[in-house]
Regions:
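Peripheral interaction segments used for macromolecular assembly
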Residues: 1-90
Length: 90
């Protein structure tokens, strides 16, 4: 339940690495049971949606911090997790 609450808290927050904004969390992807977040749908500055795995993100006040932009996975991975999980906003 704590993980789910942390996932919900990340909605609409900026995703940043070393002070650089990479995008914004637009949805939380939950596991198949809808109980735990597995990652985030991030709308990036280039207009593309990418998948950010939940364990790689740190909620820090008003933003989500990641160690590297390489942690944002391509659309294919986002589609996989959407298909095998549940979007919070669905």
């Amino acid at each position: 339940m704590v993980a789910l609450m942390r996932g919900v808290e990340a909605l609409n927050k900026r995703v940043m690495t070393s002070g650089i904004e990479l995008g914004r969390v637009v949805d939380v992807i939950l596991d198949e049971a809808g109980e735990r977040p597995v990652g985030f749908d991030v709308l990036c500055g280039d207009g593309s949606h990418r998948f950010l795995p939940f364990p790689t993100a740190r909620l820090e006040g008003e933003h989500v911090e990641v160690d590297s932009s390489l942690l944002l996975l391509e659309r294919e991975q986002l589609d996989f997790y959407r298909k095998h999980g549940r979007p919070l906003r669905a």
